[in-house]
Amino acid sequence: TAMVDCSDYPKPACTLEYMPFCGSDSKTYSNKCNFCNAVVDSNGTLTLSHFGKC
């Protein structure tokens, strides 16, 4: 399983940088910030499926 360090999150705003992450919920997150904010919101239930689009 790929690991992402989300210890610096959540952040109030994310950049528009596009570097997609595929979450365990089968959703594509546009970048690490958006993905990590979602991980924090999910209380750790969301994980990274793989890098790139789902």
Swiss-Prot record:
GO CC terms in record: extracellular region
Which coarse location class describes where this protein primarily resides?
Answer: secreted
User: Gene3D superfamilies recorded for this chain?
Assistant: 3.30.60.30
Q: Which PROSITE patterns match?
A: KAZAL_1, KAZAL_2
Sugar attachment sites are 43
Give the UniProt subcellular location, in the record's own words. Answer: Secreted
Q: Does the keyword Disulfide bond apply?
A: yes
Recorded GO molecular functions are: serine-type endopeptidase inhibitor activity
The cross-references to InterPro entries, in alphabetical order and at most eight, read: Bifunctional_prot_inhibitor, Kazal_dom, Kazal_dom_sf, Prot_inh_Kazal-m
Q: Residues in domain Kazal-like? A: 4-54
Q: Which UniProt keywords apply?
A: Disulfide bond, Glycoprotein, Protease inhibitor, Repeat, Secreted, Serine protease inhibitor
Q: Which CDD domains match?
A: KAZAL_FS
Its domain of life? Eukaryota
**Domain notes, please?**
Avian ovomucoid consists of three homologous, tandem Kazal family inhibitory domains.
Q: What is this protein called?
A: Ovomucoid
